[in-house]
Amino acid sequence: MIMLSFMGFLQSCLLIVNSFAILNERFLNKIGWGVKSDLDMNSFKGKIITLLHSLRFFFRSMFSNI
C-alpha cells in the first residue's frame, strides 16, 4: 500500500515536470522563467529553469526521429 502511494506521487511529479517542459519559450519568458545570461544557476529557481530547458531539449530530440 505504501509503495502504491509513493508510485502515485512519483507519477504526479513526473506529469507536472512534463507539463512545464512542453511549455512554449515565449510563455516562459513572459512569466520570467526564460533562460537569461544573468540567471543565478545556484538558486532554486535557476536550477528549476535549467531542468525545464534540459527536459524540453531531451523530449524534442527524442521525438524528432518519429
UniProtKB/Swiss-Prot annotation:
InterPro entries: Yos1 (IPR013880)
Main location: membrane
GO cellular component: COPII-coated ER to Golgi transport vesicle; endoplasmic reticulum membrane; Golgi membrane
Transmembrane segments: 7-23
Keyword Iron-sulfur tagged: no
Location(s), subcellular: Membrane
Membrane topology of this protein: Single-pass membrane protein
Any one Gene Ontology BP term: endoplasmic reticulum to Golgi vesicle-mediated transport
UniProt keywords, alphabetically: ER-Golgi transport, Membrane, Protein transport, Transmembrane, Transmembrane helix, Transport
One Pfam family, short name: Yos1
Task of the protein: May be involved in protein transport between endoplasmic reticulum and Golgi apparatus.
Family from the record: Belongs to the YOS1 family.
Protein name: Protein transport protein yos1
Gene coding for it: yos1
